[in-house]
Amino acid sequence: MSEVDSIIGNKEKLESSTYKTIRESNKPVNLVGDIFENEQAISPIISKVKNRIRGFVQIQNGCDHRCTFCIIPYGRGNSRRVGPKNIVKQIKLLLEENYKEIVLTGVDLTSYGTDLEKKISLSKLVKIILNKLPQLNRLRLSSL
């Protein structure tokens, strides 16, 4: 399609080198890798909006299920998670910014921790968060 300048994969869109490659190219660029090829790390992303009460912390991305009706594994890759220590750290930063409610987000939250060497369930993660951050008034779970 002549109107398309570049195609960028979900993993590649997060890499600064992708945009340098596009900028330096004089022709359309296809930068879509195999999303199942290697395990992608996800970093917790603090989502802050000034003058808001609710802060979002991504704890999981991707999905290991291959439901016939769903495209998520092909767009997000296999399930991967952020470790509990980093999650607590991110929530603490949001609480310091006076957020009153924290929302843990992910594509398939129920799979949280299944890829960890020391398996940890979502309920165990919630207990860790509440024990380490007693000042947290509200904790919500949200999934796609």
Regions found by a protein language model. Give the residues of each.
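Proteins enriched for Cys/Gly/acidic motifs involved in redox and nucleic-acid/cofactor modification
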Residues: M1-Y112, K127
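Active-site core of PLP-dependent enzymes with the aminotransferase class I/II
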Residues: D115
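Alpha-helix-loop-beta-strand connector modules within alpha/beta enzyme cores
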Residues: K118-L139
